[in-house]
């Protein structure tokens, strides 16, 4: 498979005291011992992860938001007493040793400054703190104040607007901060620039004070009484305008969290979607599939109701769209129509949703396009991809983890192979991860030790299994004497590709059958193209068609004998394994599929030698079949633990799946190799279009790209559709994984010819330790 006319080189080989724990901080250093202790308790880990999916969403306290709630006055006492004194108690009890509040991190000093100044304000306003507590806080702000204008510091949303205003509040309260006046001037200049540049600033209205019409701000009030689900903004509104719903919202928070509030509430829907996304991205979703389905069903119900838990947050909306569509739920891109261009996006979304992480989610949503869609997702893809590329080029993504995610997704989205994605996501998974809104917060529901341990175990199990199976493949190669045949030894590459198609470690037989088939296709493709005569090629086809016993044949050459004997033995072995699990013989099906592939290879051979090349339609009638997609996939489907009937394999659905994946990969191949193949006088769809229609190379490549996109959309539609489908979804996913392989190999270069990235990915999967010992 993926082998026609290619030259394969030689194989290369917390935030705060309440939520802080030593196991969180020092986890990476103790990971190895933790995993070793858990190796025999995987079922316990699965139960814990299931509880994470079903249980309450956990979130860390926000010193910043708790401080704003603490500033709300009690109306019954003419505003001379705090409405929420318990928040004041929490502030007093949770100052860090260095005088700050909030996360202590050298890259998040702006966060610390914002939290610390916010906490000093209610302490000063209500005069409840000891002088030393205030002095320590003021000293921290003074000593760290230079970070307030440091562009290399990660900035909370609205910092440049809110922090200067809090300085003004401090002055009004006669709280002397001892800040350099030049620095203060710069901060207020930056604030004015932000106010001029940005629209939709209601999310950070606490930084606008009396300059904003709070009645207009309250027009953004949500059904739960909050403003943007932000305790700080809601508290600020309550300070400026008494509103019963705002008060009820804050009361509800304190009934839940008792003495503090988070920076966002509620966030159940978003957190659960993030959790599902992470579990899928780490490859451990199969352990909690029923629980994930419950989450998606509830999300779809909210989607249909246009619930504000989804639709008031662009990030959540985009993620919900992608996850639901990829699982076959009927969602249309109309709901993303407000974000079709950059101008519309920034004019539509609130300040909280205007960051790079939101644009990345929109970019990923734009990739799940179906044939019936209008141009919404294409327009969305155009501007989000340009925006993210510009962010990478300008090096303005200060969050290194987010930067790596953007780079990984932007490089070749459809070419991200599952097993590679799982491993790279694991390397990025950090149980101390903090998302930045107005303040940094942790969500242990999404980032936790249970998921990390379960994934580590799974990846180590996979790696051990992969190494064993590679040894089996090498022995098979030697037993079949294929190492004696001229051509590309594609064992390592073939196995790597199918390991990505079947990442579940239990699917050993499916992986091996697939890998052996791809390896044989590669050898035979080289034989037909370069090392054998037409007569020898026809002989191999005749022997397969008649299913002749290898020992009864008089062979014209050792290579013909080795190739046919290997084919006969491998087909027999695969058929026997399928019979053992399915109770029916598919040998005739495998032979038929081999004849189809070899006939297509012969057609390629003849087209290269013909005086008149085939036209485009004639070429596309045989060239996609020479890749052997159905030959590689269909036998393997019988070894995946699903009951596969003959009717399934011969269904129109299966035919269409094979057609679209084969055509798309053939065109991806041709698009990348046409310049070389034109010099070699090898038939290629790009050159056929150029010659037949007398069009430029650029126009031909553009037409081919549109065809690739068409067949990719059609394939995805078949994979995700539920109604009328006869193949199990697990089986249809193999066709989708296969097109990912095509994008991986041919989207930007011919990786069979220049396999540098593939070398790195193979090393990562097969050899690099899953857990790295920290010094």
Swiss-Prot record:
The cofactor binding remark recorded in the entry reads:
Binds 3 Mg(2+) ions per subunit.
Query: In what tissue types does this protein appear?
Result: Ubiquitous expression in roots, stems, leaves and flowers.
Q: Name one GO cellular component term.
A: chloroplast
Task: Give me the residues that bind Mg(2+) 3, please.
Answer: 669, 672, 677
One GO biological process from the UniProt record?
Answer: terpenoid biosynthetic process
Annotated InterPro entries: Isoprenoid_synthase_dom_sf, Terpene_synth_N, Terpene_synth_N_sf, Terpene_synthase-like, Terpene_synthase_metal-bd, Terpenoid_cyclase/PrenylTrfase
Q: What are its cofactors?
A: Mg(2+)
Keywords on record: Chloroplast, Lyase, Magnesium, Metal-binding, Plastid, Transit peptide
UniProt keyword Metal-binding present: yes
Question: Where does it mainly reside?
Answer: plastid
UniProt-listed Pfam families: Terpene_synth, Terpene_synth_C
Q: Could you tell me which cysteines form disulfide bridges? A: none
Task: Give the domain of life.
Answer: Eukaryota
> What's this protein's family per the entry?
Belongs to the terpene synthase family.
In the UniProt entry for this protein, what further remark is given in the free-text comments?
A: Abietane diterpenoids (e.g. miltiradiene, abietatriene and ferruginol) accumulate specifically in the periderm of roots. The ent-kaurene diterpenoid oridonin, main constituent of Isodon rubescens, accumulates in leaves.
UniProt name for this protein? Isopimaradiene synthase
Q: Which organism is it from?
A: Isodon rubescens (Rabdosia rubescens)
């Amino acid at each position: 498979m993926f082998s026609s006319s290619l030259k394969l080189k030689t194989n290369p080989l917390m935030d705060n005291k309440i939520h802080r724990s030593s196991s969180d901080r020092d986890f990476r250093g103790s990971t190895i011992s933790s995993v070793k202790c858990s190796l025999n308790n995987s079922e316990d880990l699965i139960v814990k992860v299931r509880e994470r999916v079903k249980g309450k969403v956990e979130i860390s306290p926000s010193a910043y938001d708790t401080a704003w709630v603490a500033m709300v006055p009690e109306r019954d006492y003419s505003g001379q007493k705090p409405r929420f004194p318990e928040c004041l108690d929490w502030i007093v009890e949770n100052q860090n040793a260095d005088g700050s509040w909030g996360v202590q991190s050298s890259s998040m000093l702006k966060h610390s400054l914002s939290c610390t100044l916010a906490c000093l304000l209610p302490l000063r306003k209500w005069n409840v703190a000891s002088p030393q507590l205030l002095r320590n806080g003021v000293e921290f702000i003074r000593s760290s104040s230079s970070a307030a204008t440091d562009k290399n510091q990660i900035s909370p949303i609205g910092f440049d607007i809110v922090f200067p205003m809090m300085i003004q509040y401090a002055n009004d309260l006669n709280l002397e901060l001892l800040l350099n006046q030049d620095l203060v001037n710069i901060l207020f200049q930056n604030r004015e620039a932000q106010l001029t540049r940005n629209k939709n600033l209601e999310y950070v209205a606490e930084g606008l004070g009396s300059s904003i019409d709070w009645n207009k701000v309250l027009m953004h009030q949500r059904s739960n009484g909050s403003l943007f689900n932000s305790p700080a903004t809601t508290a600020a509104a309550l300070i400026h305008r008494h509103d019963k719903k705002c008060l009820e919202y804050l009361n509800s928070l304190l009934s839940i969290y008792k003495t503090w509030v988070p920076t966002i509430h509620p966030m159940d829907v978003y957190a659960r979607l993030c959790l599902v996304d992470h579990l899928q991205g780490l490859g451990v979703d199969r352990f909690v599939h029923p629980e994930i389905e419950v989450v998606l069903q509830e999300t779809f119900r909210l989607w249909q109701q246009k619930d504000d838990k989804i639709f008031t947050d662009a990030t959540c909306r985009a993620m919900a769209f992608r996850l639901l569509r990829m699982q076959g739920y009927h969602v249309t891109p109309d709901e993303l129509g407000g974000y079709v261009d950059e101008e519309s996006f920034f004019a539509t979304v609130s300040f909280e949703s205007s960051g790079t992480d939101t644009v990345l989610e929109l970019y990923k949503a734009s990739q799940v396009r179906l044939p019936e869609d209008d141009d919404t997702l294409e327009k969305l893809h155009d501007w989000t991809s340009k925006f993210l590329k510009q962010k990478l080029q300008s090096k303005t993504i200060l969050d290194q983890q987010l930067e790596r995610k953007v780079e990984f997704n932007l490089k070749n989205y459809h070419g991200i192979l599952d097993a590679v994605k799982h491993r790279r996501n694991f390397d990025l998974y950090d149980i101390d991860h903090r998302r930045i809104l107005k303040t940094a917060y942790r969500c242990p529901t999404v980032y936790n030790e249970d998921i990390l341990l379960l994934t580590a175990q799974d990846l180590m199990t996979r790696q051990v299994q992969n190494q064993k199976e590679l040894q089996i493949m090498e022995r098979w190669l030697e037993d079949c004497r294929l190492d004696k045949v001229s051509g590309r030894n594609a064992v390592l590459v073939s196995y790597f590709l199918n390991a990505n198609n079947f990442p579940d470690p239990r699917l050993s037989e499916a992986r091996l059958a697939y890998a052996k088939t791809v390896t044989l296709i590669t050898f035979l493709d080289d034989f037909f193209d370069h090392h054998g005569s037409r007569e020898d090629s026809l002989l191999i086809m005749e022997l397969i068609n008649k299913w002749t016993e290898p020992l009864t044949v008089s062979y014209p050459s050792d290579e013909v004998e080795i190739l046919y004997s290997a084919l006969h033995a491998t087909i027999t072995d695969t058929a026997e394994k399928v019979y053992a699990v399915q109770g029916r013989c598919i040998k005739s099906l495998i032979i038929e599929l081999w004849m189809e592939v070899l006939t297509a290879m012969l057609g390629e051979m003849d087209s290269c030698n013909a005086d008149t090349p085939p036209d485009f339609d004639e070429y596309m009638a045989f060239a996609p079949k020479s890749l052997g997609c159905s030959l590689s996939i269909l036998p393997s489907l019988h070894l995946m633990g699903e009951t596969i009937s003959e009717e399934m394999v011969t269904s129109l659905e299966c035919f269409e799946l094979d057609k679209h994946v084969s055509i798309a990969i053939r065109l991806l191949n041709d698009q990348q190799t046409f310049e070389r193949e034109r010099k070699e006088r090898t038939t290629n769809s790009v050159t056929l279009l150029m010659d037949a229609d007398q069009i430029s190379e650029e126009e031909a490549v553009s037409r081919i790209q549109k065809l690739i996109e068409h067949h990719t959309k059609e394939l995805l539609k078949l994979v995700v559709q539920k109604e009328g489908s006869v193949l199990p979804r697990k089986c249809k996913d193999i066709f989708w994984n296969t097109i990912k392989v095509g994008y991986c190999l041919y989207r930007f270069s011919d990786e069979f010819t220049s396999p540098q990235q593939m070398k790195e990915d193979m090393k990562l999967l097969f050899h690099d330790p899953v857990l790295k010992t920290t010094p």
